[in-house]
Amino acid sequence: MANVTYGEVTQVIGAVVDIRFKPGELPDLMNAITIRSSEQDAGFTAVAEIDVMLEAMQLLGNDVVRCVALQPTDGISRGMKAVNTGAAIKIPVGEGCLGRILNVLGQPVDEAGPVNASDYWEIHRKPPALVEQLPATQQLETGIKVADLICPYAKGGKIGLFGGAGVGKTVIIQELIRNIAYEHGGYSVFTGVGERTREGNDLWGEMTESGVIDKCALIFGQMNEPPGARLRVGLTGMTVAEYFRDFSGLDVLIFIDNIFRFAQAGNEVSALLGRMPSAVGYQPTLATDMGYLQERITSTRKGSITSAQAVYVPADDLTDPAPATTFAHLDATTVLSRAISELGIYPAVDPLDSTSRILDPQVVGDKHYDTARGVQKILQRYKELQDIIAILGMDELSDEDKLIVARARKIQRFLSQPFHVAEQFTGSPGIYVPTSETVESFSQVLAGKHDNLSEDSFYMVGNIDTAVAKAKRLEA
């Protein structure tokens, strides 16, 4: 039984609440503390019902604890009674979370009744011990050609999705959730950190329509929430994912949108606690906070957690402390380009900017590595030739360069792919392409086996066989 103690509110400054406890009854750091109307002394009156969860962050001395609220502090006043629960925040975990929208405290916000929880876990958990972690590096097949070929994702790794508004980050996220659910039997957890409420609602609606909602848990800490909630919602999502990994033995995918807002929330909390700011005004514990979350994303012998994190880059400055700290943890970066989306090529992934740690012959094999580098080499040469083409035209190019341009344009279109979750918009059925077929298809294009096919044959198809079939249809 947790050691429950009682304190009294002495100060309220926005999201920060100071509480004095009796000597010897101080809560541990990270303990959950509640302030509720129902726990007050007789005679207490309030305009509205108060039910606020806080987390102990600092021990100030003189038996006073400084706490950060995870919910709005409206209605809290000096002299109110606070209850130390004797444990960290606990949330429901298990398959009952699938198809539901939860907040940072694990409370349902979708008006669909209580969560049918398998268990309740604390959100503050240690990462797996080194002996439990899976040493081998494996590729997680996504069925998305450009990702599997150019920037393969590591099972249990961390992927950064970089891109502006409207270039297709959400569609890639939905397709990954769908492919993991249908092709691998896995579950996904979507964690909205500082997410716009409208975007979260749109995502839920689209996932319900596309039929993947039953394989996904949605955890939201919207941008109107106090900074404490936005700082901890990532841990709530991780805890839900860890249960599936450790108890169901599954390969779980967790999405964090946006990891920058996680750092931003830590910045706000740090300032509220009175800490001296560090570089560019960020909290001095930025690297520690980031590592605390990221180190829990890993493969074990039971299962894996793979994360895809949207990364906002302030003022396009990659040296800003928030994205710079995130880079240190990423295994793969998928860069979405507006220039490619303007060509109508989706997913609009830039194959020259996207990278992966496991694009290595010892991991993916020589054929995969050589094919990926060959694709990048041709696309890079095409990029260099575009200025010449724009000024002088194609006729001034050598025969070799003309061939490179022709193949590059085919490869560029071949990197496009119809998605299952976008069927209602494109009218084309989605296609899942295994990595082996992707590598073989691009290998044949590089070898010149399909130089006779038109560029249109390669647009929005799956493997090379579907491109050949499309070419025959176009000729007919």
UniProtKB/Swiss-Prot annotation:
Catalysed reaction equations from the record: ATP + H2O + 4 H(+)(in) = ADP + phosphate + 5 H(+)(out)
CDD domains: ATP-synt_F1_beta_C (cd18110), ATP-synt_F1_beta_N (cd18115), F1-ATPase_beta_CD (cd01133)
Residue sites binding ATP per the record: 163-170
Intrachain S-S bonds: none
Localization: Cell membrane
Protein name: ATP synthase subunit beta
Record text on subunit structure and interactions: F-type ATPases have 2 components, CF(1) - the catalytic core - and CF(0) - the membrane proton channel. CF(1) has five subunits: alpha(3), beta(3), gamma(1), delta(1), epsilon(1). CF(0) has three main subunits: a(1), b(2) and c(9-12). The alpha and beta chains form an alternating ring which encloses part of the gamma chain. CF(1) is attached to CF(0) by a central stalk formed by the gamma and epsilon chains, while a peripheral stalk is formed by the delta and b chains.
NCBIfam families given in the database record: atpD
PROSITE patterns per the UniProt record, alphabetical: ATPASE_ALPHA_BETA (PS00152)
Lineage, top ranks: Bacteria, Bacillati, Bacillota, Clostridia, Eubacteriales
